[in-house]
Curated annotation (Swiss-Prot):
InterPro entries per UniProt: Ribosomal_uL22, Ribosomal_uL22_CS, Ribosomal_uL22_euk/arc, Ribosomal_uL22_sf
Signal peptide residue numbers: none
Keywords: Ribonucleoprotein, Ribosomal protein, RNA-binding, rRNA-binding
Family according to the record: Belongs to the universal ribosomal protein uL22 family.
Record GO biological process: cytoplasmic translation
Quaternary state and interactors: Part of the 50S ribosomal subunit.
Role played: This protein binds specifically to 23S rRNA. It makes multiple contacts with different domains of the 23S rRNA in the assembled 50S subunit and ribosome. The globular domain of the protein is located near the polypeptide exit tunnel on the outside of the subunit, while an extended beta-hairpin is found that lines the wall of the exit tunnel in the center of the 70S ribosome.
The protein, known as: Large ribosomal subunit protein uL22
Keyword Ribosomal protein recorded: yes
A Gene Ontology molecular function term of the record: rRNA binding
A cellular component annotation (GO) from this entry: cytosolic large ribosomal subunit
């Protein structure tokens, strides 16, 4: 579902020191995306990729700080409510690798890249329904999410 051009919510983008990537209309949970991106924002790019690999392997949970109603605590010292959003982690990893390749194409040092902006926005709802008995129907909608990542080469 391509809708043409879009703009990033990140302001003051410097093309000399920064690279960016985005995923549009992804069929992943907006709530899990917000929680996961909060966790990787501010990380070095390579550390974030390792963290996402651990989430996909269900070794490290993602802390749920906002959307945590009836959420079980996860093992670990002082760890509260958390989950393993594997589907979201795979999608975010793809976008991070895209940002890494974009930075490499610009000639930036990929070992010094830091995630300075990671945001998730709700996308359009894909409407569907399930036919029920006696001519009724139950809505069966699917949420979509827009994700944007900006990385910056930090100076030594």
């Amino acid at each position: 579902m391509s809708r043409g051009r879009f703009s990033y919510s990140f302001q003051n983008f410097d093309p000399e020191r920064m690279a960016r990537a985005s995923g549009r209309d992804l069929r992943i949970s907006p709530k899990h995306s917000v929680e996961l991106l909060r966790e990787i924002r501010g990380m070095m790019l390579n550390d974030a990729l390792r963290y996402l690999d651990d989430v996909i392997a269900k070794k490290r949970p993602v802390p749920m700080k906002r959307f945590n109603d009836s959420q079980g605590h996860k093992p670990g010292k002082g760890f509260g409510p958390g989950r393993y959003p594997v589907k979201v982690a795979k999608a975010v990893k793809k976008i991070l690798l895209n940002a890494k390749n974009n930075a490499e194409q610009k000639g930036l040092d990929v070992d010094r890249l830091k995630i300075i902006h990671a945001a998730a926005h709700r996308g359009p709802v894909l409407r569907g329904y399930i036919p029920r008995a006696f001519g009724r129907a139950t809505p069966f909608n699917e949420q979509t999410t827009h994700i944007e990542i900006v990385v910056e080469e930090i100076r030594r």
